[in-house]
A protein has these predicted regions:
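Solvent-exposed, non-transmembrane regions of membrane-associated and secreted proteins
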Residues: 1-149
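C-terminal single-pass membrane-anchor helix
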Residues: 137-172
Length: 172
């Protein structure tokens, strides 16, 4: 679907459809029935991510964002810029802040809180602002290390396994 970039907390993560455990263990999930991450009036995209996984950073540092910070969604060859305008902690069943608001273009990022307890939800909402390409100069062009390691580690394990199997054949 694209990817989200939050330079303040140094993340660049893929956005996948759905919020299954498989999706959330490797990136950010798009909440079903929320607006697709393509922007436009009368839209409200909801993106969810895990916090505190031992194997990945994901949304672990989402609580470090402040009102006025920006995040970017890269989708359909466009860069959508959002300025954080609201940060709230709510109970899991409190969803009023996730509704579409007339004439607004919002994206809300959700993760569990407090860290390690996960009884509430942290909602970080951004309102769409005009993207200025000069803003990109300070932003990372690298994908998070988590994404690199999810490719590198399996390849290394496969290579090691092949070498071991090859050596066992030679010895026999």
């Amino acid at each position: 679907m694209g990817y989200i970039e939050i330079s303040k907390i140094n993340i660049k993560l893929p956005i996948y459809q759905g919020t299954s455990e498989e999706v959330l263990s490797r990136g950010v999930g798009h909440l079903d029935y929320s607006s697709l991450p393509v922007g436009g009036e009368n839209t409200h995209t909801i993106l969810t991510g895990h916090r505190g996984l031992p194997s990945a950073k994901l949304f672990t540092d989402l609580d470090k964002l402040s009102e006025g910070d920006r995040f970017y969604i890269h989708s359909l060859d466009k860069v959508l810029a959002y300025k954080v305008d609201q940060i709230k902690v709510v109970l899991p069943h409190e969803t009023d802040d996730l509704q579409i608001v007339e004439n607004k273009d919002y994206t809300t990022l959700i993760t569990c809180t407090p860290y390690g307890v996960n009884t509430n939800r942290l909602l970080v909402r951004g309102e769409r602002v005009e993207f200025n390409p000069e803003e990109k100069q300070g932003m990372s062009t690298e994908v998070s290390m988590f994404n690199k390691w999810t490719v590198i580690v399996p390849i290394l394990l496969l290579c090691t396994l092949l070498v071991v199997m090859y050596k066992k054949k030679i010895i026999r």
